[in-house]
UniProtKB/Swiss-Prot annotation:
Family the entry assigns: Belongs to the sulfur carrier protein TusA family.
Gene3D superfamilies per the UniProt record, alphabetical: TusA-like domain (3.30.110.40)
Organismal lineage: Bacteria, Pseudomonadati, Pseudomonadota, Gammaproteobacteria, Alteromonadales
Main location, first listed in the record: cytoplasm
Protein name: Sulfur carrier protein TusA
Alphabetical keyword list: Cytoplasm
GO molecular function: sulfur carrier activity
Recorded GO CC terms: cytoplasm
Gene Ontology process terms (BP): tRNA wobble position uridine thiolation
Catalytic residues of the enzyme: C19 (cysteine persulfide intermediate)
Organism name: Shewanella oneidensis (strain ATCC 700550 / JCM 31522 / CIP 106686 / LMG 19005 / NCIMB 14063 / MR-1)
């Protein structure tokens, strides 16, 4: 695991879930987090490579890092406002 991903304050395992479940779980988890906290998302649905970055942009969260060259995919996001 890359060092940047190990800094996450929260972790969400979305392995085995298919669209739209991963993004719905991310949204629910982020709602319970404080502004500025980070979330590591681990997923294997190819749709997350498009959906997670779009979710972050739409909801004003920051996509700090992503690893999508191999599964499981990893995303590190920081909660915005």
């Amino acid at each position: 695991m890359n060092d940047v991903f190990s800094t996450a304050q929260h972790k969400l395992d979305a392995l085995g879930l298919r669209c739209p479940e991963p993004v719905m779980m991310v949204r629910k988890t982020v709602r319970q987090m404080a502004q500025g906290e980070t979330l590591l998302i681990i997923a294997d649905d190819p749709a997350t490579t498009r959906d997670i970055p779009s979710f972050c942009e739409f909801m004003d969260h920051t996509l700090i890092a992503s690893e999508t060259m191999q599964t499981p995919y990893q995303y590190l996001i920081k909660k915005g406002l």
